[in-house]
Amino acid sequence: MLKILIPTIMLFPTTWFMNKKWLWSSITTHSLLISLLSLSWFKWNMDIGWDFSNQYLAIDPLSAPLLILTCWLLPLMILASQNHITPEPLTRQRIYISLLISLQVFLIMAFSATEMILFYIMFEATLIPTLIIITRWGNQTERLNAGTYFLFYTLIGSLPLLIALLFMQNDLNTLSMFIIQYSHLPNPSSWANKFWWTACLIAFLVKMPLYGVHLWLPKAHVEAPIAGSMILAAVLLKLGGYGMMRIIIMLNPITKEMAYPFIILAIWGIVMTSSICLRQTDLKSMIAYSSVSHMGLVAGAILIQTPWSFAGAITLMIAHGLVSSALFCLANTNYERIHSRTLLLARGVQVILPLMATWWLLANLANLALPPSPNLVGELLIISSLFNWSNWTILLTGIGVLITASYSLYMFLMTQRGLTSKHLMNLNPSHTREHLLLTLHVLPVLLLILKPELIWGWTF
């Protein structure tokens, strides 16, 4: 653990004392080396399932893939941000990179925390750098509105969790994940315990986000700069899913009777948000709503608590993290050239940037869960476990899958095919940096086809 955490913290002095000429290249190289070193986390200790760094930090098969995804994303965010941050004053460039590094530190500590209160502190700490990135480096003036939505939705959702954790500490005298899961609640059917159950989960449902409390996400995604969109889609939403998987084991047996409305909302949200995608004119907004749709599947899977659904949830979270981040990078390459996110203004780009069209096709096919992508593995595990739980769910999940395929192909056709507009004839060519960035997104997805058990979690 410390072999990753200490080099990551040492990126701060590197950022502030590095010569301007080598700033971006050195930070990218160092963070890429850290991410390659983090791949050693796949060799967790299978005898006990946990690899302890100390009393408060440990890794298991559930947190290892998410930790590696977090480390993998930092060099990609820095690569993606170079074009639009480089013209700014040097101090602002250093602050921007420092915020991205601090996000990685907080996320590593959140995913490896074994104490619930440490997890909560790190869960909340990720809010500050993300908020600054959105409100300071966003493209339009609506970024302040988006930042306000993001802040208040997340904080109002998280406060009940803090109160619930303090009650738990008072009752059990510990907040260690290892001990809580073996302790039982007195009188699980009481109203107080039902409120406590809701308080424990609502923070994670807002963060995922569940349909109904998702309005902050499209705003935050649309207004955030590219690095903000990438970290939000790839890792911060997964923090909600990870928190749910950790805490829901401790909430039995109340979950069996309390989960029904949330499962219904999650599955209904899959169809609703997929339908919203079909009528979006804004490219980033469409990708943001598709994230809500995929996270609805994950939320439903976690709430029914079967080994298959847990494996499907973690698989889909990792696969979706890489694919949605790649889609945001592609949307950003369009935005940097056309200076508009409107789908209609970017038609026929395939003729001008043919290799970029290949990346669009690969990312969209992975997004619609084409076999044999890990997205399909996750969706099949989730849909089959939901069908086993209730046969009627197949109607909604099936419709959701069909609409997902529709809007993914619609997104590809609208941006790449059709007659090329006159104003697109003088576009800048694509850069090696952009192709490297997209290779580093798509390659892990293709490699995970060969060994998907790396991201199945601890239920197999």
From Swiss-Prot:
The entry's keywords: Electron transport, Membrane, Mitochondrion, NAD, Respiratory chain, Translocase, Transmembrane, Transmembrane helix, Transport, Ubiquinone
GO molecular function: NADH dehydrogenase (ubiquinone) activity; ubiquinone binding
Family annotation (Pfam families): Oxidored_q5_N (PF01059), Proton_antipo_M (PF00361)
EC number in record: 7.1.1.2
Name of the top EC class for this enzyme: translocase
Compartments where located: Mitochondrion membrane
Catalytic activity: a ubiquinone + NADH + 5 H(+)(in) = a ubiquinol + NAD(+) + 4 H(+)(out)
Annotated family: Belongs to the complex I subunit 4 family.
NCBIfam families, sorted: NDH_I_M
Name of the molecule in the record: NADH-ubiquinone oxidoreductase chain 4
Gene that encodes it: MTND4
